[in-house]
Amino acid sequence: PPASPPVISMSRLFLSQVAACLAVFGLCCSDAAVLAYQETADPSRFELTELVRGLVQPMELAVGPDGTVWLIEISGKLRRLSPGSSVPELAGELKVTTEQENGLIGMALDPQFAKNGWIYLQYSPPDYPGQHISRFTIVDGQLDLSSEKLLLKFEEQRKECCHHAGSLHFGPRGELFIATGDNTHPHGDSQGYAPIDERPEKAPWDAQKSAANTSSYSGKILRIRPTPEGGYEIPEGNLFPADGSAGRPEIYAMGCRNPWRMTVDQKT
């Protein structure tokens, strides 16, 4: 039988919220339980190393096989930090809109990056009302803009803010996971609670149109398998059939608010 799809976990922010809840719970329990929690959260177990300063809204980073750190800024800049250096070099820049939390918001290196130089970027073009997920090639340490292969694009509303999420990660079998936000205003009449507003003029405040919609790419974790030609396949294990008869076949998980960051368990 085919292998089960990997288990995906939410961002560090989510994990920190869980840890905070456990801490509060520990206050209501025995002293031993509190001490046990304190031991598992001992910050002295971690070593902090400062790599660089002066970045403007860095979004994601990835470490290449040779130790080079690749990172993106929301303004559209891709930077490269060589091993032993504290000065990141500009490796390329995409034209993006940065309104309403848009911009260059996701990045992942291809599992065979050392051989093919492929890098995947999730960004918000200024001339398209939505998001692009594209593959580019790094040539001599620089982003070759002419090498772009557009894998996936989807429209969003830009009348109101917010929630575009944006995070890319590869799984152990070459699957690319893509985090997308619900593209819904979190405030206003909903007062920070789940935005469900079916009044026609309140569409930007209604997440039913996105996170709960099987025909929308927004408010989801998508899962595809990129092909060398620049397209992608649908791996087994997604929510809906590959023929699109019941929903977008790229959807792996739905009902997400704003999955800002994620990790993929490479063992499972």
Which residue stretches match the model-derived regions?
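Beta-propeller domains
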Residues: 70-92
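Short, Lys/Arg-enriched N-terminal segments with co-localized hydrophobic residues
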Residues: 1-9
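Surface loops at the rim/top face of extracytoplasmic beta-rich domains
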Residues: 71-76, 100, 113-268
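Bacterial N-terminal signal peptides
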Residues: 17-30
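A short helix->beta-strand "capping" segment at the edge of beta-propeller domains
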Residues: 37-55, 148
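Short coil-to-beta transitions that initiate beta-strands within beta-rich domains
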Residues: 54-58, 99-104, 217-220
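Beta-strand-rich domains and repeat architectures in extracellular enzymes and scaffolds
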Residues: 50-76
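Blade-loop segments of beta-propeller domains
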Residues: 87-109
